[in-house]
């Protein structure tokens, strides 16, 4: 009796499950139609799945910008193309003349820069304020000008006579202290004179003082631009 009852219940379950299966099978064609339409729409808008959307620069890269010459097949073709792109070849005399012209042009520019012409100066040296600072520095004797000669002399003596190093070190320290004091005095003097001569100046005293100290630390003959005033001259 239990087996018969079990079979009946199993049969009822099959009967109950058959309409559900039929309903599922009946829904499959509709789902297939909707999924097919969705994928077709997606492929039209976003492209195939699994690939990133191309960026604007990548899409432009693939577009043709114009006719492209074919690549050379031999070394002779490559040489011919390089010659055609390089233009006409200059002779030896023409190259020498071009080098001489460039050298003369550079020499002229340097001479005008050393003479202090405003159009050929470096950006740090341009302007009437910087010119006035240079004149102030060039019109006085500066202890900072001894920096390079004293440093070179110290190095030479230390390598030639190492025993004198013990006596030269304190002397160099004293000289460095004096040069520092001279740089401070020069910076204050330059700032005061610039404020008097150029009341509308907007450049800070600190920058002008550094510019003056840097020029004063150079040897007079090597200063660029060249000094326009003599030592002890009146700069106004």
Curated annotation (Swiss-Prot):
It is a multi-pass membrane protein. Residues 32-47, 67-78 have a biased composition (Low complexity). InterPro entries: DUF3043. It holds the Pfam family DUF3043. Residues 1-12, 52-65 have a biased composition (Basic residues). GO terms for biological process: symbiont-mediated evasion of host immune response. Residues 13-31, 90-108 have a biased composition (Basic and acidic residues). This is Uncharacterized protein Rv2206. It comes from Mycobacterium tuberculosis (strain ATCC 25618 / H37Rv).
